[in-house]
Amino acid sequence: MKIRNSLKSAKVRDKNCRVVRRHGRVYVINKKNPRMKARQG
């Protein structure tokens, strides 16, 4: 999982990427390609 300041570039890497909020943190997850994960902060 990458930790990034901005998730905009992480979101557009793949069309299956979704932005979700968990426990006050923002994550990018991808069910089809689980390697495409990122967290903001």
Swiss-Prot record:
InterPro entries xref list: Ribosomal_bL36 (IPR000473), Ribosomal_bL36_sp (IPR035977), Ribosomal_L36_bact (IPR047621)
GO terms, molecular function: structural constituent of ribosome
Domain of life: Bacteria
Keywords: Ribonucleoprotein, Ribosomal protein
Stored SUPFAM superfamilies: Ribosomal protein L36
Statement: the UniProt record of this protein carries the keyword Isomerase: no
UniProt xrefs under Pfam families: Ribosomal_L36
Coiled-coil ranges from the UniProt annotation: none
Secretion signal, residue range per the UniProt entry: none
NCBIfam families: PRK00831.1, rpmJ_bact
Protein name: Large ribosomal subunit protein bL36
Protein species of origin: Granulibacter bethesdensis (strain ATCC BAA-1260 / CGDNIH1)
